[in-house]
Amino acid sequence: MRLAVNIDHIATLRNARGEQEPDPVAAALLAERCGAAGIVCHLREDRRHIKDLDLARLREAVTTKLDLEMAMTGELQEIALKTKPELITLVPEKREELTTEGGFDVARHFAVLKEFLKPLNDNGIEVSLFIEPEKKAVDLAREAGADLVELHTGLYAQKELENNTDLELQRIREAATYAKSIGLRVVAGHGLNYRNIGPFREIPEIEEVSIGHAIIARAVFTGLDEAVREMLRLIQ
């Protein structure tokens, strides 16, 4: 299993003082040196953490894989086509939320989604949809033109706090198995941390996990290099 490191909260920390440090690009390069297989950043519509300049600099610097998380808007589509990350992940977005609260509603946006994805597909940019671990969502993601799906693990993380993860883990496992069986690649993310990541080693269909907040929080105490390496030890 591979690790993609989300560096959004390096930018959050920088923006808290309106300064230049810490630098998200420096964090991305360090994560890569420590074994991360990809770097994730979310260019939100309100630019609350990652800024346009950060994205441009990340595109120049990242040598593994750059995964741009974004909402389905014309502005961000143009930015993606110009920047050409290896992967874009479409996520739902609400201005009032602290973090992404759920999976993309593929059924609701299906007709528009197919048209939105076409120029990205045509320009060689792989597309992932951040979805709930449900068979219908997986089917629609494939039909819309996604190359892979990122299964939303937020409810699993919430259940972990309640010591009640079995049903949600089974739902994720079944969705991953089904997605793989119909030709989609599978990754997972949201709320994963050093306590709850272990069971994902037993789901071979999930090829990568995307983790940000837990790693950045651990890095405050251990340093980013050790935080990344510790997570890699847990997933490999």
UniProtKB/Swiss-Prot annotation:
GO terms for biological process, alphabetical: pyridoxine biosynthetic process
Residue ranges of the TM segments: none
Keywords per UniProt: Cytoplasm, Pyridoxine biosynthesis, Transferase
Main location: cytoplasm
Coiled-coil annotated spans: none
EC category name: transferase
Positions bearing the site annotation: Transition state stabilizer: 150
Pathway(s) it belongs to: Cofactor biosynthesis; pyridoxine 5'-phosphate biosynthesis; pyridoxine 5'-phosphate from D-erythrose 4-phosphate: step 5/5
Positions contributing to 1-deoxy-D-xylulose 5-phosphate binding: 8-9, 44, 49, 99
GO molecular function, one term: pyridoxine 5'-phosphate synthase activity
A GO cellular component entry from the record: cytosol
Domain of life: Bacteria
Binding-site residues for 3-amino-2-oxopropyl phosphate, renumbered to this chain: 6, 17, 191, 212-213
Cellular localization per UniProt: Cytoplasm
EC number: 2.6.99.2
A Pfam match: PdxJ
Catalytic reaction annotation: 3-amino-2-oxopropyl phosphate + 1-deoxy-D-xylulose 5-phosphate = pyridoxine 5'-phosphate + phosphate + 2 H2O + H(+)
HAMAP family with a match to the protein in the record: PdxJ (MF_00279)
Subunit comment: Homooctamer; tetramer of dimers.
Function, as annotated: Catalyzes the complicated ring closure reaction between the two acyclic compounds 1-deoxy-D-xylulose-5-phosphate (DXP) and 3-amino-2-oxopropyl phosphate (1-amino-acetone-3-phosphate or AAP) to form pyridoxine 5'-phosphate (PNP) and inorganic phosphate.
Family: Belongs to the PNP synthase family.
Protein name, as recorded: Pyridoxine 5'-phosphate synthase
Taxon lineage: Bacteria, Pseudomonadati, Chlorobiota, Chlorobiia, Chlorobiales
